[in-house]
Amino acid sequence: MHNKVVHTLARSLSAAGGATVRFNFRGVGASEGVHDDGVGETQDALAVVAWVRSRWPAVPLVLGGFSFGGAVAIRAARAAAPAWLITVAPAVDRVRTDDLVLPQVAWLVVQGADDDVVPANTVLEWMGERAPQARVRLLAGTGHFFHGRLHELKACVSEEWPPSLNRLEVPAS
């Protein structure tokens, strides 16, 4: 939650007119609980989605995440049914996926070609086998934390923003 990639993703979505919620998964920061290999963290994400929808039921949901959070967003997307799914360097090899039914939603994957934490070939192979409808943006010369390339991540979000979500208006709460 407190890294520059997550902040850039949140700012990019805010610039498009959306409200954003960032949170820690169980066992991270001051959160209670322990790491659960993506299963419990999916429940955490769905609890946040339920809270957001209770506050702003008429606003389209955009679900996103970075690294482990990206993989959890994929796991949560089928139940959450977002209008758009954005995963940045999703750590698909670090969460359980054998029980996963992928969502049929508009989906953007942004991946650094030189990522040494979540290798691009791992993500591309996983996506190609399971999610051919996803739009993949592979950024040359970019590592896991997008050092010196955050502007490219922001541009990807802006350029790929679905027209159906234009002019989001989030009512004041």
Model-based region annotation:
Residues 1-24:
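Short, surface-exposed "cap/lid" segments of acyl-processing enzymes
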Residues 5, 35-55:
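Alpha/beta-hydrolase active-site loop
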Residues 65-73:
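Gly/Ala-rich beta-loop-alpha elbow adjacent to hydrolase catalytic centers
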Residues 103-104, 108-111, 115:
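Short beta-strand/loop motif that positions the catalytic acidic residue
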Residues 113-118, 144-145:
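Acidic catalytic loop of the alpha/beta-hydrolase fold
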Residues 119-128:
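Short alpha-helix in the alpha/beta-hydrolase fold that links the catalytic acid
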Residues 128-145:
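Catalytic histidine neighborhood in serine/cysteine hydrolases
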Residues 147-161:
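Post-His helix in hydrolase/transferase enzymes
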